[in-house]
């Protein structure tokens, strides 16, 4: 299969005109924000397979997405340092220029009927992405003043190189994402399942989050956590269920069973181990 399409995103009213505070961080409006445009293309193949008692599908696709005037929230001094909170420091949505996201995606879906009493369902997926800024040294905006980050003055001219912890990749993106889910159906009534989720290390964040003073005085532990989890995140979930009858199912679900600490972005802890008892009814 193949596909090609174009996209257009107009800035939201909040990005254009609303200045606010979120969890102690100032968010500034940008009435000069330009729309984001782009195109995407995909080339893939989906193949049915059968091996002994297993049947399923394998899907492989390559993709590329190109963006122009991409919008991204960037840290800087956007407000008057004499009158605004935190000396005018905060985030604002700005156009960072031309970007590209390319990669491959593999997905597998299969079922094996081992015997009359056991059926196994498998679902797996893996995505590799290479999200980059085409011109990391290009000045895309100017802040009001300079910021001292780890002893280096940044600004007022902002580039992707001087505002990022790793400018070789877009901020807050993963390059490797994988998930595997296995479900065992026993005697049609008992269900056991497990899933594993993996993402690699988030290499690029706003450079300000790596500042030693910020890590010591305002948001302790960001650098320590990034170093601790530099190999990425591996999360395990399990579930068990029993079909009470044709219309009712009782399930026990445990997410993040090993209670791993992980973050989707700096200072944003994701849920710890959760245990849920679920009753599903068909009415």
Residue positions per predicted region:
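Extracellular loop and loop/strand-boundary signature of outer-membrane beta-barrel proteins
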Residues: 26-31, 90-96, 163-168, 222-226, ...
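Gram-negative outer-membrane beta-barrel transporters
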Residues: 53, 57-66, 88-208
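Outer-membrane beta-barrel signature, preferentially recognizing the C-terminal barrel domain
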Residues: 7-67, 78, 83-113, 170-176, ...
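Flexible, solvent-exposed coil segments and beta strand-coil junctions
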Residues: 17-27, 77-90, 146-163, 214-221, ...
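Outer-membrane beta-barrel translocator domains and adjoining extracellular loop/strand segments
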Residues: 14-19, 26, 70-77, 129, ...
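Transmembrane beta-barrel domains of outer membrane proteins
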Residues: 1, 5, 44-48, 100, ...
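C-terminal beta-signal and adjacent terminal beta-strands/loops
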Residues: 8-9, 66, 198-222, 230-283
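Transmembrane beta-strands of outer-membrane beta-barrel pores
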Residues: 4-10, 17-19, 47-49, 62-69, ...
């Amino acid at each position: 299969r193949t596909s090609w399409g174009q996209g257009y995103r107009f800035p939201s009213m909040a990005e254009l005109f609303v200045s606010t505070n979120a969890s102690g961080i100032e968010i500034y409006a940008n009435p000069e924000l330009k729309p984001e445009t782009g195109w995407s293309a995909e080339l893939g193949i989906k193949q049915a397979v059968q091996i002994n008692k297993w049947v399923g599908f394998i899907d492989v696709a390559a993709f590329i997405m190109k963006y122009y005037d991409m919008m991204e929230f960037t840290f800087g001094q956007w407000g008057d340092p004499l009158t605004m909170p935190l000396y005018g420091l905060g985030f604002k949505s700005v156009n960072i220029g031309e970007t590209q996201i390319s990669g491959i995606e593999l997905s597998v879906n299969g079922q094996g009927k081992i015997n009359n009493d056991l059926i196994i369902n498998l679902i797996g997926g893996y995505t590799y992405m290479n999200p980059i800024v085409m011109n990391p040294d290009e000045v895309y905006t100017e802040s009001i003043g300079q910021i001292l980050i780890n002893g280096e003055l940044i600004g007022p001219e902002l580039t992707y190189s001087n505002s990022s912890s790793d400018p070789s990749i877009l901020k807050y993106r993963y390059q490797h994402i994988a998930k595997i889910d296995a479900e065992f159906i026993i005697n049609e009534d008992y269900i056991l399942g497990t899933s594993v989720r993996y993402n690699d290390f988030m290499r690029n964040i706003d450079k300000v989050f790596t500042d030693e003073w910020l890590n010591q005085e305002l948001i302790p532990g960001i650098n320590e956590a990034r170093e601790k989890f530099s190999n990425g995140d591996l999360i395990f979930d399990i579930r068990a269920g029993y079909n009470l009858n044709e219309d009712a199912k009782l399930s026990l679900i445990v997410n993040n069973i090993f209670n791993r600490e992980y973050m989707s972005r700096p200072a944003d802890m994701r849920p710890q181990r959760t245990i849920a008892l679920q009753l599903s009814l068909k009415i």
